[in-house]
Every structure is written in C-alpha cells, then in structure tokens.
A protein has these predicted regions:
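N-terminal carbohydrate-binding accessory modules
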Residues: 1-55
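Short, well-ordered coil/turn segments that N-cap beta-strands
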Residues: 24, 52-54, 88-94, 149-156, ...
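An active-site-proximal structural segment forming one wall of the substrate-binding cleft
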Residues: 76-98, 117-157
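Gly/Pro-rich turn-and-neighbor structural signature
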Residues: 152-223
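Aromatic-lined substrate-binding rim segments of carbohydrate-active enzymes
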Residues: 40-109, 178-181
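Catalytic-core region of carbohydrate-active enzymes that cleave or remodel glycosidic bonds
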Residues: 85-88, 92, 178-180, 201-283
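Aromatic-lined carbohydrate-recognition surfaces of secreted/lumenal glycan-active proteins
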Residues: 97-100, 149-165, 172, 179-180, ...
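Conserved, mostly hydrophobic/aromatic
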Residues: 20, 48, 56, 87, ...
Length: 283
C-alpha cells in the first residue's frame, strides 16, 4: 500500500492520485514564453479553468534561458515563478516538459545556437552532449522541483526529453517502445495522436474511414496495463506552414465537430491523462 502522506502524486492502472484524491488530468498546452507578459498569465489560466480543464502542460525553451554556455538566466519575462504562482491562484495543475529538446515548432527545437558547435551527437548519452546540458538541467530542475506539489506548488508531472522517436512525436501510435520496465522506460507510458494531420488546404478530406481510432483502449491494456491511459499530446489544431493556405482552413480542420467526436472517442477508451495541443490563441 502506498502512503499518500509520503507521496503527493501516485497512480494506479486507472488514474493519477493527487494528495490521495483520484483525478482525471485534463490539460491544455500553453507556453508562457509565447506570451511573455506575466501579468496576463492568471487571466489565461482562469479562462483555461473555465473551459473545463484542470491542468496545463508547458514546454521550457532552453534557448531563451542559456544564451551562452554556463550563463543561465530565468528572470523578467522569462521567470517561471510568476507562471507557477498564477497557476496556483487559478487552481490549475502543471505538467512540466523541460526537454532539453522540445521541438515545439521553434528553431532548433529549443536548443541554443551554441550547441551546434558541440562535438557530441545530440540527443545521445555521449559525454560532450550530456555535459552541455548539465547547467540547464540543474537550474531548471531546481526551479521545477521548488514548484512541485510536494513543496506546495502546482507541478504534478514532468516529462523527460520530448519526441524522441524520431523527432516529431512521443510515439505517434500505440507501439509500446517506451513502457515501464523497458530500458529508459518512464513511470507512465503515453502516446500522441494527430488523426487529422495538418492539411489545412483541404480540411474536409480528412473525414474518411480509418481516421477514427477504434482500438486504442485495448492496445493500451495490452502494452501498459499497470499505468493510467495517457495521451500527452492530442490534436487541438493544425499548423499553417510558411506559404501555406491560411489559418481559416486549419480552423475548419480541427473544428467543434472534430473535437466532439474524437475527444469523446478518447474518453470512451478510458483516457485519464489527456493533454490538448494547443489551446485557443496561445500558440
């Protein structure tokens, strides 16, 4: 039996427990560095809460915090304490995703430019690369730990690395490469889902047979039965790339009908950690 007095966040095969209370973690993705106005963060969190979410997932952008090797600075609009405080005031739990690689559709995936001169192979255990991440990980890890629910803060989950297979997804489908017990496996297994892709030029073409998953719940039970069903990223919109067709088509692609059908479909599979990437106009 796990002692909830000792651990603030635990889980079983059904859901997370936060301070002993069973919850469904339903979160929206929001990145403070994309809206670098700390005075607006509480308003954003309150609106997210009003939409029915109880959590927010966020990336940390290493490139903005360590512009030169060994010089870490998370101050001013890049300070995270106001972000954590605003989440606490709004009653929002946080899911921290500090990378060091984040992708996030940013230049270099959030890597600082000076890392290109590193002699080690990036995203491996080569010492030159690992040593280059030490200063960032030590500082951001300390900030996140201080804001953990165990220390009275809002952070309840942390994702190590991001989109490791290979560059643009956390398992794009339920394969089971990273499940508890396997080398490098996390505590809780999860996969991503972008069933409609990003063809904003022809959004209606996505409504075809085969787009709606029918077996995700069963697949989860087969490959990670001891953890709650988790989707750390599920489609909440689409990307309009440079020279694309325009955001109007993207709004049609992932509209209210998509949300009603696909989100409820995931609820039917028993998802208990469900993160929408991204929310509203915060991207």
């Amino acid at each position: 039996m796990v002692s909830f007095k000792r651990l603030s966040v635990t889980w079983d095969e059904h859901s997370l427990f936060i301070r002993g209370e069973r919850i469904m973690f339903y979160s929206a993705e929001f990145h403070p560095w994309r809206l670098p106005v700390p005075g607006l963060w509480l308003d954003v969190f309150q609106k997210i809460k009003a939409l029915g979410y109880n959590g927010v997932s966020f990336y940390v952008n290493w490139a903005l915090l360590e512009g030169s090797p060994g010089h870490f600075s998370a101050e001013g609009v890049f300070a995270y304490e106001p972000f954590f405080d605003a989440a606490s005031k709004a009653g929002i739990y946080l899911f921290a995703r500090p990378g060091p690689y984040i992708n996030a559709e940013v230049s270099g995936g959030g890597y600082p430019r000076w890392l290109q001169r590193n002699t080690g192979t990036l995203r491996t255990n080569e010492s030159a690369y690992m040593d280059a991440t030490d200063n960032y990980i030590a500082h951001i890890g300390k900030l996140i730990a201080a804001a953990s629910v165990t220390n009275g803060g809002p952070v309840v989950l942390l994702q190590a690395e991001n989109e490791y297979v290979p560059l643009v997804n956390n398992e794009a489908s339920i394969i089971g490469l990273f499940t508890p017990g396997k080398p490098g496996g996390p505590d809780i297994y999860g996969h991503d889902g972008y069933p409609f892709g990003f063809d904003c030029a022809d959004p209606e073409s996505n409504w075809t047979p085969g787009r709606l998953p029918i077996d995700w719940g069963q697949l989860h039970l087969e490959i990670s039965p001891s953890t709650p069903y988790s989707i750390p990223e599920f489609q909440g919109g689409a990307i309009d790339s440079w020279g694309g067709s325009g955001l109007e088509g993207c709004a049609v692609l992932a509209n209210h009908e998509f949300e009603r059908i696909f989100y409820k479909n995931n609820f039917g599979f028993g998802v208990k950690l469900f993160n929408i990437y991204m929310v509203s106009a915060t991207y």
